[in-house]
């Protein structure tokens, strides 16, 4: 039986699926067709039912829970690892300049909405692939943006300004770990 798997190229996903994808464990009659994509594309693929097993944003789980069940392993939750809202200009959000967001159904976008609602902040969004957003800031093609992953450790060196650590904001308001993403399987 061939199963369609969708994961991102991030180290978490490739580590979790490494043994399976490299045939290091006996999977019997199961074969895998793997798609590597950014998380928004994976979220959309899950909504369309394109995959048998797929990594999604927890912010998208409610959109697919009728077709997919959440696996008990492989999820990403934690402290101190949420998305950052950064700017090339200042430490405050300019409501007249769109915020670059790595996808409509991403946890990063859900955390941005959570912060904006809690702080009564208004903003406009522009969606782009997550790995393009940071480069756009560095190249001055974008003024303010959400960034995820490793860039949280380098933004100050790169001359960018922190508007809000959305993960830290979530942790303070909820006293819960940041729900980033999980792996779901077709029901």
Protein language model regions, located:
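Conserved beta-strand segments of alpha/beta enzyme cores
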Residues: 31-33, 69, 121-124, 161-162
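Short coil/turn connectors at secondary-structure junctions
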Residues: 30, 65-68, 93-97, 140-142, ...
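Short, well-ordered coil/turn elements that cap or connect secondary structure elements
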Residues: 27-29, 65, 80, 94, ...
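N-terminal hydrophobic or amphipathic helices and topogenic motifs
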Residues: 1-73
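Pocket-lining segment of extracytoplasmic ligand-binding domains
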Residues: 126-187
